[in-house]
């Protein structure tokens, strides 16, 4: 059956700022307290969506979350009106204000794990929301992510959206950023690789930085998504690269159809994994980047593997990269050698995503891949599908509501909260989503 990969990109939120909230993510830590530009961040992401859609790659958008998120501050003991809550937390515990204002939902590779209908026992597309419980600011995302996905994939005959796993460390789940799918054409059954960093009773784990994904979580997600057990491989990420800042597998590997593009040190027992894939995936091709050509450190600083590998109709592939790859002489030299070599990659597309990159999120972080048949694609909420009309509407929306300068101190401004709610209220109408945000359900919005 014919099917396509649709990339659902996260729209950067109005409170995009640099707070260094993500231990283990070296870019996040390095850019802590810098002044951010939310308007530019959103426009950089939108431009990527527009250009890829214009090049013939199906593209859609997932909206940002409500931030600052006042309900959590109330859970933490701050009381009064919304404005009073903001004032109290800014004065008494400003670190909480930064956490509940994070624009991290823009990295929708962590929103959920997807199983296309060709891989599932019931023939539906399954989406399991990630609990993201390794980081407080990200653990807040799951309920609204679930509401958004249910508003986008709202045909229950074709889509099943599952709630996140219980919020405990044993079941730490980071979504599609730790998941790859390999196979032939998108509509054919594929092999799903669930990548984890730790498991109970296994001493092979990182020592410097946390392993956010557990094998126990990966197994549970595979069950929830009803993936055919014959089409699942569980693979451990190399703990040494986690300790070098590879906090998700999509920082060290990316797959598309029959190709796995990865660093030679990406996985524990890598040669064994690749042999398994060669035996189980027709035409499997591993493009392993040697450490002698690109070190793990350079891969992390340029986000070489946090790229998108996209298929053209003729079977050739395009590698979508951040600007940082072009600016690194060694990485750019390797990429040009890759283009000349015998593999399906025939074009490099480079995007300036500096605002997101400075918080540790490249092209792959910003997108959630969903393989859909034509019938399934028609069942998706059409208002979120990217085209010139939607791009222009969203670009105007960003110009109207987003600030071009934001510091941590600005997060306490009650006007920022009001601007954000008004913006999201308008956006839910633009994208035909209904009332998906808590402030709307409490009677504060018109969505």
From Swiss-Prot:
Its EC number is 3.5.3.23. One of its GO terms (biological process) is arginine catabolic process to succinate. It catalyses: N(2)-succinyl-L-arginine + 2 H2O + 2 H(+) = N(2)-succinyl-L-ornithine + 2 NH4(+) + CO2. One of its GO terms (molecular function) is N-succinylarginine dihydrolase activity. Keywords: Arginine metabolism, Hydrolase. It is an enzyme of class 3 (hydrolase). Substrate binds at residues 19-28, 110, 137-138, 212, 250, 359. The keyword Hydrolase applies. The active site is at residues 174, 248, 365. Pathway: Amino-acid degradation; L-arginine degradation via AST pathway; L-glutamate and succinate from L-arginine: step 2/5. The keyword Amino-acid biosynthesis does not apply. Belongs to the succinylarginine dihydrolase family. Homodimer. Catalyzes the hydrolysis of N(2)-succinylarginine into N(2)-succinylornithine, ammonia and CO(2). This is N-succinylarginine dihydrolase. It comes from Escherichia coli O6:H1 (strain CFT073 / ATCC 700928 / UPEC).
